[in-house]
């Protein structure tokens, strides 16, 4: 629930934040470094937390967030300890940290443990300080258990009546090394590993996945291992990595998973993604669009390794993993409109509204695509930006199962 907390954190800057000056010696590394002044400006934000998602339901609690500013008066460190309650998971205690020592270097961590089923331990680092900024390293380590996971079946027309619940216990890593070729091109080599266990879910009243489906029907239902290597080619003219307002982006990716290297099955992923950003009126209005084609080829591919739609970054009218099959097509279109910019407690926040349309479908093969299977999800997003690094959002999408509300970090694309 740290995503929900993040947006509420930004909102609370207008309500309950206070600013203090703390000697830098009292804030040792990695909280501060030589980019901070002395004393350090710290904005403290205590606030209640209320969050909702289609799969998890309602979560409530409280947090205190600390925003540490560097000598350029930018938020360079954020810490957010939190405690919350959800009827499915009990009490969860967590701490989230984000550190931005350089524009080309950042790391994040999250430590969360619930009294029932759920836990979330993550560490992420991005560093592009090697080879004069041409070499980019990304590392993501995780151990996560989500007791709210859902499975409805394969193909586009899976009815809601087939809904099942399970706990997805996922431990693994994702590594990549990218090298810039010229100004706009990058080649990326990646390595990914995950060990997935499927256990009894935490949501009462919804059947357990293995009570309705078998391993023959749903490969990976008893757990699986994936060890994959990938190669990507990227072309980008974006003017910023996290919050672009101008430019285009294209990526082609091939990923291979093989039994000989420890995977549960032999299969391949192919994906093509294109997105663009067109600004108007000095970027007060930004038209953002994305198109994706994803395909999975192989036999007995674990269900969580197939092509998946649904959730906060794809079809926002549905919960995560709502549609699963061999491939999918996806189109996202939204108009990001900056309503106002407001400075409170020496922190400047941009507030945006973003009407959007998500259109997509899963299918057995591209040749079997049918217009009647396309999901049309209109919706509205509200975003708050504390530049250059903090982006919180609430997106409300509408699908055939009813409305879905997502609260998260960063833009959906």
Predicted regions and their residues:
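Gram-negative/organellar outer-membrane beta-barrel architecture
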Residues: 38-40, 44, 52-219, 225, ...
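Outer-membrane beta-barrel "beta-signal"
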Residues: 19-21, 231, 274, 382-384, ...
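Membrane-embedded beta-strand positions in outer-membrane beta-barrel channels/transporters
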Residues: 45, 61-63, 78, 94, ...
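Bacterial Sec signal peptide processing site at the extreme N-terminus
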Residues: 17-34
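Membrane-embedded beta-strand positions of outer-membrane beta-barrel proteins
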Residues: 46-48, 79-83, 109-111, 137-141, ...
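C-terminal outer-membrane beta-barrel translocator/porin domains of Gram-negative envelope proteins
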Residues: 26, 213-222, 226-351
